[in-house]
Regions:
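Oxidoreductase cofactor-interface core, primarily capturing Rossmann-like NAD(P)-dependent enzymes
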Residues: 2-47, 60-63, 70-72, 81-91, ...
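A hydrophobic C-terminal alpha-helical subdomain
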Residues: 195, 233-290
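Rossmann-fold cofactor-recognition segment
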Residues: 51-61
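Hydrophobic transmembrane signal anchors and adjacent membrane-proximal interface regions, especially
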Residues: 56-57, 92, 276
């Protein structure tokens, strides 16, 4: 008499940033595919109502993070909110993932991550990548360009002001980053190892100057928006009124200087390769959000 065969449970996926734009979209897409992922959140009350497997932890709490990641096979690690100690938080969370036995981490990094990147926050992403590589955990890096969703938010009273010059940026929609992450995770869960150690550069379908982006915003929203060039000194002076710490002001200004440097003048096929569809243009993104 043959014994009944018991199938092993599917790999457990955990998603961080599940109450945010990218992590939340990935969580919803994975749920639609089934089974639903574990959501690692800072505040359980903000988790979506459908979530049954919710773990509470912050990136900087090693003990809580280790417990939250117990039994997890594949982890989407959405980069933490900008802060002075973000790198320390990232390293702590990666150490917790390794200790918990996580087999593979998909990390949302930044296009051009490097120790000397013009965009200051890209340096933190590079250091995070290096720590992830040293951890021994499997990895896939999604190096996103600036979010296209963020471009309209740069305007203050209809003016985008900064030292970006004629530089161009291949900004990518958050929705496309989420779809790309979901595709990678789906392959990993299915046992497809093509993404092991892979680095994907995710951009939109076009690289725009900020003046061109302002024109697109005007046409798509009906809100007159223009770009005004600033010197470096003007950029720092105009942002000093917010009382932000130096590291944050440096990050704000380097958003523009990174564009001016040409570092973000990139258009790749990363989104289409992973998702099978062309990425959204800024005009399409804004039309979808009307």
């Amino acid at each position: 008499m043959s014994l009944p065969q018991h199938e092993s449970p599917p790999p457990l996926v955990a998603v961080t940033g599940a109450t945010g734009k990218v992590g939340g979209a990935v969580a919803e897409q994975l749920r639609a595919r089934g089974p639903a992922p574990r959501l690692v959140v800072r505040d359980a009350s903000r988790a979506p109502g459908w979530a049954e497997d919710v773990a509470v932890a912050t990136y900087g709490d090693y003990q809580a993070a280790t417990a939250a990641l117990a039994g997890v096979d594949v982890l989407l690690m959405v980069s933490a909110s900008e802060s002075a100690d973000r790198l320390t938080q990232h390293r702590t969370f990666i150490d917790a993932a390794a200790a918990a036995g996580v087999r593979h981490v998909v990390y949302t990094s930044f296009l051009g991550a490097a120790p000397d990147a013009v965009f200051t926050l890209a340096r933190t992403h590079w250091a995070t990548e290096e720590h992830l590589r040293a951890s021994g955990v499997g990895l896939t890096l999604l190096r996103d360009s600036f979010y296209a969703d963020f471009l309209p938010e740069l305007a203050v009273d209809g003016v985008i002001a900064g030292p970006a010059g004629q530089g161009r940026v291949g900004a990518v929609a958050r929705a496309d980053v989420a779809r790309a992450a979901t595709a990678v995770i789906g392959d990993l869960v299915a046992g497809d190892r093509r993404h092991d150690g892979a680095v994907y550069e995710l951009t939109g379908p076009e690289a725009l100057t900020l003046a061109e982006a302002a024109a697109v915003i005007t046409r798509a929203t009906g809100r007159p928006t223009v770009y005004r060039e600033q010197t470096l000194e003007e950029a720092y002076a105009s942002r000093s009124v917010y009382g932000a710490p130096d590291w944050e002001v440096d990050a704000w200004v380097s958003t523009y200087t990174a564009i001016a440097s040409g570092a973000l003048d990139r258009v790749t096929d990363g989104v289409e390769r992973l998702t099978g569809r062309r990425p959204l243009s800024l005009a399409q993104l804004l039309a979808d959000h009307r």
